[in-house]
Amino acid sequence: MELTEAIRRRRMVRSFAPDPVDPDLVDRLLEDALRGPSAGNTRGVAWVVLQGGDTATYWEHATTADWRSSARRYPGLSRAPVVALSLCSPAAYLDRYGEADKRHSGLGTSDSDGNRESAWPIPYWFGDAAFSALLLLLGVTAAGLGAAFLGNFRGEQPLLEALGVPDGWRFFGAVLIGERDGLDHPSPSLRRPPAVGAGAIHRSHW
């Protein structure tokens, strides 16, 4: 599938078949996802892949029992055979931008309270995690599978601890991967007009 076709075909899938996905394909998709832009070539993004029964760890910590029992979409989402968790390391970027060739940026310095993150108007670590997640979504689409991105809303620290993630890493979001089961209900959000064309692209001036 050509890139333009993958971009235009990509949709968030919220109902999956439980059929397993080839682990070699998952590895290839993640390797491609890690080829995205990386500020200062820091490479401070990583993925934790949960497959089969291991996906329950994600749902247990990132959602609540009330939500799981009441959300109409939960059964379809929870059938996704792969849950890939996008992680990023703020410390990796803070250290990288404190090195000699980046020190002039001022992004590796601390404020009066010793907070090194306050110098960053837009933290690069979240941007790089987003680039990687988008590449994974596009790669999954190009492979003929369905995918959905779920943000980090709750349970971040317990989830990281349960997975043995080293201290200092942040959970950015989860990409669900699997075959579509044909039972997805279109999101009401799709009724909103797309942000394309003259309304969203401005030349020379807003």
Task: Enumerate the predicted regions with their spans.
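A short N-terminal beta-strand-loop micro-motif at the entrance of redox/enzyme domains
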Residues: 12-28
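A glycine-rich helix N-cap at a beta->alpha junction
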Residues: 70, 74-80, 84, 163-187
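C-terminal helix-cap and adjacent tail motif
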Residues: 3-13, 88, 92, 172-206
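Short amphipathic alpha-helical segments
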Residues: 1, 23-32, 56
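Glycine-rich, charged/polar anion/phosphate-binding loops
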Residues: 31-35, 67-71, 159-161, 184
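Glycine/small-residue-rich phosphate/adenosyl-binding loop
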Residues: 42-129
